[in-house]
């Protein structure tokens, strides 16, 4: 581990930027004067909250920038023990401090998006307390610390959505609960896009060309890596698939905006009767320069709609469900989500930012990315694209 930089938080606590691995590492100085990696209970997360509270607005500290909305601090640290990419500490049951233990290559999309969403009054996310970024002449700005409100008993969509779909497929009396949930999520996504409407612009011919090229490259990669049912089907129907995703090259002029960029049910938490969107880091499979670019609103809509289809696949993996009932619930969830989204967007006066034309192509591209992800990182997930690809290719609707 090589130390590149440090942010002094006072009281023998600091944040260190390292390479090999690239990480933001909280450290505490012991009584003997030696520095070590800090854990929950060592007070570094508390010190981070104090620093944000003492530096409102945007302040520079060497190569670090603090962006703070915090009007309070908190005491008492405990870990979040579920599996996650980064390391998070709950402070005083009020805030969550997330250390970026795997630094993304900059420029990072989250700081600008979160700042804009908060400034435009978007409330469909955990309330941000502050951010810390790091930038040098050799390293574009990247996110090293995120601090958000703590949401007790928050559950992500791979839990709440699977449970709701399972219940609805087993008992029609449970359908209204599913409809209410996906309606709420559709409204939140619409509110997100409305809050970013001032970033909208027409896509250029170069944008459309890059989307087509990236999609065809995804087809090639998925066809090469896929060795299961979905890979075989993709190779057999490659011409059909390329024809669908190739239409992304015809989208010059479509509105693009600073959307979420990696939206799926796993990014939507249910907490205290509300649904909130998390993780504005952009799609991790894309290079840094692509993650910060504006996207069609349909990308977020397609990501959520297709993930709802995947929820149904997961549901029947773990519970025996009548195929016809599950198919009805799957279709209802997706159409309800898209309908709620478009209705809410229109009510907010920003229907013009959404063009549904690329919805099918973007859903298909997402399934191909699932093949690649499963092949490279999580083979046990392959059952999802194995079921999703034939269903989508044979589907007669765009939702």
UniProtKB/Swiss-Prot annotation:
It catalyses: D-glucosamine + ATP = D-glucosamine 6-phosphate + ADP + H(+). A motif (Substrate specificity determinant motif) lies at residues 366-381. Binds 2 Mg(2+) ions per subunit. D-glucosamine binds at residues 262, 370. Mg(2+) 1 binds at residues 267, 279. The keyword Metal-binding applies. GO terms for biological process: carbohydrate metabolic process. It is an enzyme of class 2 (transferase). SUPFAM superfamilies: Protein kinase-like (PK-like) (SSF56112). Its cofactor is Mg(2+). Mg(2+) 2 binds at residues 279, 281. ATP binds at residues 98, 149-151, 156. It comes from the Bacteria. Monomer. Belongs to the actinobacterial glucosamine kinase family. Catalyzes the ATP-dependent phosphorylation of D-glucosamine (GlcN) to D-glucosamine 6-phosphate. May be involved in the phosphorylation of acquired extracellular GlcN derived from the hydrolysis of chitosan, i.e., in the incorporation of exogenous GlcN into the bacterial GlcNAc metabolism. Is unable to phosphorylate maltose. This is Glucosamine kinase. It comes from Mycolicibacterium smegmatis (strain ATCC 700084 / mc(2)155) (Mycobacterium smegmatis).
């Amino acid at each position: 581990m090589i130390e590149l930089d440090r942010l002094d938080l006072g009281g023998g606590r600091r944040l260190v930027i390292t390479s090999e691995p690239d990480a933001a590492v909280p450290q505490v100085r012991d009584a003997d004067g030696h520095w070590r990696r800090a854990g929950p209970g060592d007070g570094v997360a508390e010190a981070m909250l104090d620093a944000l509270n003492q530096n409102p607005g945007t302040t520079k500290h060497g190569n670090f920038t603090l962006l703070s909305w915090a009007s309070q601090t908190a005491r008492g640290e405990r870990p979040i023990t579920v599996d996650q990419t980064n390391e998070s500490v709950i402070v005083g049951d009020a805030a969550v401090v997330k250390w970026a233990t795997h630094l993304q290559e900059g420029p990072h999309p989250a700081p600008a998006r979160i700042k804009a969403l908060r400034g435009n009054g978007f409330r469909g996310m955990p309330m941000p307390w502050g951010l810390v970024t790091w930038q040098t002449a050799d390293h574009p700005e990247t996110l090293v610390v995120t601090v958000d409100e703590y949401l007790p008993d928050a559950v992500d969509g791979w839990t709440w959505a699977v449970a709701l779909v399972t219940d609805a497929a087993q008992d029609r009396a449970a359908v209204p609960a599913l409809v209410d949930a996906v309606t709420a999520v559709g409204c939140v996504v619409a509110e997100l896009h409305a809050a970013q409407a001032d970033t909208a612009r027409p896509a250029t011919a170069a944008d459309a060309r890059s989307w087509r090229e990236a999609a065809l490259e995804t087809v090639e990669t998925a066809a090469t890596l896929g060795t299961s049912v979905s890979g075989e089907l993709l190779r057999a129907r490659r011409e059909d698939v390329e024809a669908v995703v190739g239409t992304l090259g015809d989208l010059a002029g479509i509105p693009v905006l600073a959307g979420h960029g990696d939206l799926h049910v796993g990014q939507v938490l249910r907490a205290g009767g509300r649904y909130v969107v998390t993780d504005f880091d952009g799609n991790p499979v894309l290079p840094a320069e692509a993650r910060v670019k504006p996207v069609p609103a349909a990308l977020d809509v397609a990501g959520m709609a297709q993930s709802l289809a995947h929820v149904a696949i997961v549901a029947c993996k773990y519970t025996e469900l009548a195929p016809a009932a599950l198919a009805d619930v799957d279709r209802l969830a997706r159409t309800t989500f898209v309908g709620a989204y478009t209705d809410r967007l229109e009510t907010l006066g920003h229907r013009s930012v959404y063009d549904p034309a690329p919805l099918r192509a973007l859903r298909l591209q997402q399934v191909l990315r699932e093949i690649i992800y499963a092949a490279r990182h999580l083979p046990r997930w392959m059952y999802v694209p194995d079921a999703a690809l034939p269903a989508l290719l044979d589907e007669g609707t765009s939702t």
